[in-house]
Amino acid sequence: LVNAGGDLLHRGGEPITVGIEDPRRPFDNVPPLTRVTLADGGLASSSGARRPLRVGTAVFSHVLDPRTGWPVEHTLAATTIAPDAATADVATTVVGVLAVGEALAFADATDGLACHLLDCCGGQHSSRRWPRFGAPDGSERPQASAR
C-alpha cells in the first residue's frame, strides 16, 4: 500500500477497507461518508474541504471547471477507483467537474474506472462498477447509492 497525500495505490495481498471522508465534516475521528473495499488498484478523492479557495468572505472549492473558469459547486466530493493511482487522480478531477449524470456515464464508459460522488444537496451517486463495502469481488453496487 502506498499513500501519496491521500491518493492510494494497493497491489497484491488482502483487500483493504478505505473510509471516504465526508467533506461536510472534515474532522478526524468522525464516521466516513462511505467505505469501499480496494483489492488492487488506485483510489483518489477530491473535495473542497481541505483546500478551500477564499475570496474575501466567500469560500469556494479549489476545483475549477476549465470550461467556465469558475469553482465547481454541484459536486462536493468525488472519489474514483482506477487501475493505478495516477489515473484515479486525474479521473477524480474529471468526474468532479462534470455534472453528476455526465460523470456517472463517463465512469461507466471508461474501462477499469468506478466513481462515487457527493452532490451539493447531500445525495450520493455511484457508477455501476463502484464496489459495495464488504464485497471483495466488487460485483455489487453500494446499497447507499442513489442514481
Question: For the regions a protein language model found, what residue spans apply to each?
Answer:
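Mature catalytic core of soluble alpha/beta enzymes
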Residues: L1-R147
